[in-house]
Amino acid sequence: MERLILKKLLNWKNSPYRKPLILKGVRQVGKTWILKEFGKRYYDNTAYFNFDENEEYKQFFETTKDVDRILQNLMLASGQKITPEKTLIIFDEVQDCPKVINSMKYFCENAPQYHIACAGSLLGIALAKPSSFPVGKVNFMQIDPMTFTEFLLANGDENLANYLETVNTIEPIPDAFFNPLYEKLKMYYVTGGMPESVKMWTEARDVDAMQEALSAIIGAYERDFAKHPNISEFPKISMIWKSIPSQLARENKKFIYKVVKEGARAREYEDALQWLVDARLVHKIYRSTAPGLPVAAYDDLSAFKIYLVDVGLLRRLAQLAPTAFGEGNRLFTEFKGALTENFVLQTLITQFEVTPRYWTQTNPPYEVDFLIQRENDIFPVEVKSEANTASRSLKKFKELFPDQVKLRVRFSLDNLKLDDDVLNIPLFMADQTDRLIGLAMEKRLR
């Protein structure tokens, strides 16, 4: 499989400011495979150390802070060779090894000639603890589920992926590309972007195996809930997790605690919800009161929406059968377009530094699905799971904030086009949002 993060890893390798790397990502998103593949492509050899399978490795970090001695002990214990600049050193499953994480300070300061990458499940939880990592002494990188573009590459559709990457004008996509891209996107909604699920489809075309892969991943996540230090939070985390399809099936997708459990209150469940956020199993999107900068200054902390880390996992958790793939556009519109909204949010999270927000108004009701910050501009985004749809909320938003709105963005089943200041992006081009906004802004300035 070709993962686009390999380019970022190569930039890290070649950077004169390189520090030990901590690669974050949910369980089974492909962290270990990526690092091993990176080592195979760009280094003479890879030295791999798994602290879950070989707990004795932890002792080497507990008895000394001397990096040369640590590496000597690791080489003697494992029989692996480590050469400065030539070897990629991978420390895997480090989430329960604070001494290993803290040792990155000494590798950074005293042994920058060694290229070290750390990975582990639930690292977001570990790093949220006080004094759990050396500030300023490590580089962070996030790996998310495979994008639609990566899915196309894995599926052997390099021509379609390459076409999307080379679109450089805001003009309608020819039917020769438009139609097959929508069919492929339907399948991506089914598989999602978890590598094992994608593999079961792209290599074996085995729907049952794909379903089992997604179920196994969900099961692994649910077993992780028990790792919360306060065991009483375990059932609360589980209830929140299982409520997400119901939350997103509502017309108003604002997270409601009573959907989790009748009579539930925020103060009883907010720690459990934060655990899911820190684990990056869910994305928490706050309501914004206005399109101002910095966006965090306008957050309504009492109102937010919750999305799953992956659209395929959401489909499986919601128990939507893969057969919906063949039923016209049903997969796009199923349960209030939740799959489509989750898919778009996934792509925006990976493209923009600032987490998206959303905006609502009551009496009469209007909702802009997302607000995205690109440089110093904020763009309202509406997600439609059908074609030929009106954008009354985008219109209202511009009426209220005319000076702040340079461009409005709509995702739908319609073709690529720019109508005045409304940029319509076909759903299958969501990975190209940042670039397309740039092209649209240039076109409007001409």
Model-derived regions, located:
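A cross-kingdom feature that marks ATP-driven nucleic-acid transaction machinery
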Residues: K13-L21, Q28, E37-R41, D271-R446
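Conserved lysine of the Walker
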Residues: K31
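Conserved P-loop NTPase "ATPase switch" module shared by AAA+ and STAND
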Residues: I82-K99
